[in-house]
Design a protein with these regions (language model features):
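Catalytic phosphate/nucleotide-handling subdomain of diverse soluble enzymes
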Residues: 31-98
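Hydrophobic alpha-helical scaffolding
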Residues: 19-22, 47-51, 102, 106
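Short, small-residue-biased leader/transition segments that mark boundaries at the very start
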Residues: 2-7
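Generic long, charged, amphipathic alpha-helical segments
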Residues: 11-29, 35
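Conserved active-site and cofactor/substrate-binding residues in soluble primary-metabolism enzymes
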Residues: 24-28, 52, 56, 107-111
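Residues that form generic nucleotide/phosphate-binding pockets
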Residues: 10, 14, 60, 64, ...
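Alpha-helical structural motif
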Residues: 10, 25, 57, 74-77, ...
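Structural signal for terminal/edge beta-strands and the immediately following C-terminal loop/tail
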Residues: 91-122
């Protein structure tokens, strides 16, 4: 839980200071780097390469920025992320708005193995 708060805090802090919306993976790297700097005093310039999209983690990213987004509808959060970041919604994310739901099976944890076997016809 403490790690999650650290990541949430990093996303919020960077957004508030720089207007940049970072994804959860990049927030981990950024938080680890900040901790490293604080512990070592190392001032070497560092580049953190973001390899994930905040759109993949829209709920986590948006609720880190402001708790008012915690219960938002997924596509509303994506639209708001686009608005605040100024970054176009990726085509793959946009396409799922109208995609047909192919699987809607919900199972309890203890039923997962058997359900997968049934899907595979085994």
């Amino acid at each position: 839980r403490q790690r999650q708060m650290c990541i949430r805090d990093r996303i919020k802090s960077v957004y508030e200071s720089d207007g940049y919306v970072m994804d959860t993976h990049t927030a981990v790297a950024s938080a680890v780097y900040e901790k490293y700097k604080a512990e070592t005093g190392d001032t070497t310039k560092t580049l953190i390469a973001s390899t994930a999209s905040p759109y993949k983690f829209a709920r986590s990213v948006m609720s880190a920025i402001d708790s008012k987004y915690e219960n938002g509808e997924d596509f509303a959060l994506i639209d708001e992320l686009c608005r605040i970041s100024g970054v176009k919604i990726p085509a793959a994310v946009e396409e799922i708005r109208s995609a047909a739901v192919l699987h809607n099976t919900v199972v309890d944890r203890d039923e997962m193995k058997q359900t997968v076997l049934e899907f595979l016809g085994l």
